[in-house]
């Protein structure tokens, strides 16, 4: 009787040990709010907020949510290399179209505060960026 109870307790502990890492998963690696900056030089930086969603089939999202939000038109993640590609079209202060092309690499994948670094093109300006998941 004692032996059966001990085996049950041991089995329960093993099952919990196996299930615990699965409970710590955060879903799609890009899902969430990301903040950081981009710029053409170290002195010329622009704050950015990126909100990304995963509906089970596609990545969607917005650059700088709010009154001047820019919805993403294309968003991809290559899980083999963790390469991220985002495209959007917004407007500048004069109302003229501005194309966004963002290419980066997802890093620190095992942590909640993972980050993406890479190249940010906004209109005719090109620079680097780093964003961290909040």
Language model regions located:
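Bacterial N-terminal signal peptides
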Residues: 10-21
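Bacterial N-terminal signal peptides that target proteins for export
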Residues: 1-11
């Amino acid at each position: 009787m004692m032996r059966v109870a001990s085996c049950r307790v041991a089995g329960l502990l093993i099952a919990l040990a196996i299930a615990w890492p699965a409970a710590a998963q955060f879903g799609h690696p890009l899902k969430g709010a990301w903040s950081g900056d981009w710029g053409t030089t170290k002195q010329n930086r622009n704050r950015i907020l990126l909100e990304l969603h995963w509906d089970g089939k596609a990545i969607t999202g917005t650059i700088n949510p709010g009154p001047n939000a820019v919805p993403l038109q294309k968003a991809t993640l290559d899980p083999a290399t963790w390469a991220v590609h985002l495209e959007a079209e917004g407007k500048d202060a004069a109302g003229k179209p501005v194309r966004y092309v963002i290419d980066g690499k997802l890093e620190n994948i095992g942590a909640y505060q993972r980050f993406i670094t890479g190249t940010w093109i906004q209109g005719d300006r090109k620079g680097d960026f780093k964003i961290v998941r909040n």
